Amino acid sequence: MAWSSAGFDRWVARSARMGATAGVTMFAAAAMLAGCSKSESPSTTAAPVTKIKVGFSIATLNNAFFVGLKNGVERGAEKQGFDLVQTNANGDAQQQVNDTLNLLSQGVQAIVLNPIDSKAIIPAVEKANSMNVPVFMLDRGSDGGKVTSFVASDNVALGAAGAKWIADQLTKRYGSPKGNVVDLIGLIGTTAATDREKGFSDEIAKYPDIKVVARQEGGFDQEKSLNAMTSILQKYPQIDAVFGANDDNTVGAEKAIDNAGRYKPLGDPGHIMVIGADGTAQALSAIRAGKQDATISQNPIGMSAKAMTFITDYETKKDVPANYAWPTYLIDKSNIDSDGAKQYGLWALEVKQ
């Protein structure tokens, strides 16, 4: 048989076409398999984590206790992973309402309030209620609206403890609970002042020979308490003890006692006993110096950090207490360096103001 180059060329061309078709078919099949494999594999891209946005309105930062509250809220928010937005009302009740409404307009998912005035704050609480934003109260409460959780010391018990301490000290001095006492009330309009006054008044009334010779508002303020105590000292030559609703009240009272030349050291029969509340650095220094006898310490850092855990509990559908009483600790010269004081009372050493 004769060999034909033309026939060979036709065979090569036909083979090339068949090979190309097979290659296209195999590539298409591979692509289909790859597509199936990709669609059936789970996505490895993590969804972005959305932080809970929390608004916090504090009454003031004019004393160490409130600085402690702020520090605790910040620590708690960081630990819980919150996006925290803060405002300071600087002692202005209407400003605090406006601040709270502004926080709500920013889309916060929870609001923490430390009210200046328990009545003035009601519209802000009710607005949060209407928006289904849970309200958490810190140290001071509201007289209206729905509050999810109120975290504070038991201020009625705190006031009663102050009265009981005075009665015990007067018994040691005179053999029975008797003497003249001054009551410097806190900032009128706050639940803390109202409750402490109730606790103190109810307890001190159990001792008929203890006379409350003066009750005046100290306003949780050193200058106001200084002025109030100055007037009281001018009117009453015999005063045995002073109850200050917080340590700013007592610091003001101590200055007035000094200015009047009425200071006598611990153990002297003329010593005017002074007890306050909060456990501020000034109070601790005054206790060491013998100017103040005692303070009922409440730890605002721990208190406010605890409140932040309740926001997490609420958001994760766990039970949240309507009221949570933060523990207090009475500090005097005998226990100021004790382990108990270090654990429960010396929060002020962590605060810079």
Tell where the protein language model's regions lie, with residue ranges.
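A residue-level marker of the well-folded mature domains of exported/periplasmic proteins
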Residues: W3, C36-Q353
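Sec-dependent bacterial lipoprotein signal peptides
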Residues: A2-A34
